[in-house]
Amino acid sequence: MPTIKQLIRNTRQQIRNVTKSPALRGCPQRRGTCTRVYTITPKKPNSALRKVARVRLTSGFEITAYIPGIGHNLQEHSVVLVRGGRVKDLPGVRYHIVRGTLDAVGVKDRQQGRSKYGVKKPK
């Protein structure tokens, strides 16, 4: 326990909270351009080919973002909207691409959980 004199001399340091998505710079989403679209394999015990894109954001950061849903139309130079949110079995992937906005079209034939994949209500 510090004495009163020690506390006067130098005050207690505030605990700084570290953001989990620094490339967004405090914004809920950021626009970016795809520089590379490719697949990577998840860590053990999972096995798949997960679709990801390397995105250059308007904030100047170059990040790796996950492309959710089945099938996509993204390629190099596609303009996408990126939100925070990591993918647990892909190390280094801390962002998601928002489907149904800008160049990323919604998932085809999606019936449930449509709002997360940018799909309009079927007629």
From Swiss-Prot:
GO terms under cellular component: chloroplast; small ribosomal subunit
Keyword annotations: Chloroplast, Plastid, Ribonucleoprotein, Ribosomal protein, RNA-binding, rRNA-binding
Pfam assignment, any one: Ribosom_S12_S23
Subcellular location per the Swiss-Prot or TrEMBL entry: Plastid, Chloroplast
Gene Ontology molecular function, alphabetical: rRNA binding; structural constituent of ribosome
Cross-referenced Gene3D superfamilies: Nucleic acid-binding proteins (2.40.50.140)
SUPFAM superfamilies assigned: Nucleic acid-binding proteins (SSF50249)
GO annotation terms (biological process): translation
Subunit structure: Part of the 30S ribosomal subunit.
Family classification: Belongs to the universal ribosomal protein uS12 family.
Role played: With S4 and S5 plays an important role in translational accuracy. Located at the interface of the 30S and 50S subunits.
Protein name: Small ribosomal subunit protein uS12cz/uS12cy
Species of origin: Arabis hirsuta
